[in-house]
């Protein structure tokens, strides 16, 4: 139990939350070789014409797993500071906005394939992270709470 209290301090959760934003952004925009794209580009059409059935299972799982720490750490920070339920919705919506923004930016990266379904799978990862945090708070309240 002491190990969990050290690992899951408020400072660690803030660090995990910020680190998850960095990792998501880095992973989504690497190799950072941006190029101009006209509004008539097929890349914009590709972004808008995708469906949830697009993508292979590895990509889907990667998109989900990539955002679980964002949802988990964000939910833990909320539960420590203001457990009002509306803040969990704000967290989920802000994570989805980040995911959408990254997909739009990928239009300008020729080596990346922008797809709206990626953002939807990211949303699933955020939600899973929030659910895990809420489950742990409810069933194991002493594990994630600390005196920091």
Where are the language model's segments positioned?
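Bulky hydrophobic segments
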Residues: 1-119, 123-148
